[in-house]
Amino acid sequence: MNPQRKKRLFLILGLLAGVAVAVGFALSALQQNINLFYTPTQIANGEAPLDTRIRAGGMVEKGSLQRSGDSLDVRFVVTDFNKSVPITYRGILPDLFREGQGIVALGKLNAEGVVVADEVLAKHDEKYMPPEVTKALKESGQAASGAEAKP
C-alpha cells in the first residue's frame, strides 16, 4: 500500500469515526428529551418504564385531591375510567386544575407505581382536552363532556 493510499484510508476512517460519534451524541440527546404519553391503564399494566421521564394523562378523580397543610406537596389520582394511577406533585397547581377535569403530568414513575410529577398541565378551557387524553378516554369506552380536541 503506497503512502498516499494509506493517508486517504486513515482520513476516511477518521471521518467515519467522527460521524459515528456525532450521531451517537445526537441520538443520546434526543432520547433524553422524548417524553412518551401513557394512560393510567398502560401505567397500571406495567407498560411505562420506571425512572424515565413520561407524560401521564387522564381525568382527575373526584375526591382524590390531597394537599399538604405545611408544604406545596399535592397528591391526586388520575383515571381513564378503566384504571387509576396516583400522582404526587410539589409546587403550585395551574389555576384551571380541578377534580373531574383532564390533565397531563410530566414526571417519572417510581417502583411503587406512583408518578412523581415535576410539571402538571391542565386543560385551558371547557371544550379543550389534550388529544392524548381524548384518545385514551375513547379507547376505554368513556366520553368526557366537551372533550373534543381542537387545534
From Swiss-Prot:
One of its GO terms (biological process) is cytochrome complex assembly. Residues 1-8 are cytoplasmic. The keyword Cell inner membrane applies. Gene3D superfamilies: Nucleic acid-binding proteins. It is found in: Cell inner membrane. Residues 30-151 are periplasmic. It is a single-pass type II membrane protein. GO terms for molecular function: heme binding; metal ion binding. The chain crosses the membrane at residues 9-29. Keywords: Cell inner membrane, Cell membrane, Cytochrome c-type biogenesis, Heme, Iron, Membrane, Metal-binding, Signal-anchor, Transmembrane, Transmembrane helix. Heme binds at H124, Y128. GO terms for cellular component: plasma membrane. Heme chaperone required for the biogenesis of c-type cytochromes. Transiently binds heme delivered by CcmC and transfers the heme to apo-cytochromes in a process facilitated by CcmF and CcmH. Belongs to the CcmE/CycJ family. This is Cytochrome c-type biogenesis protein CcmE. It comes from Pseudomonas putida (strain W619). The gene is ccmE.
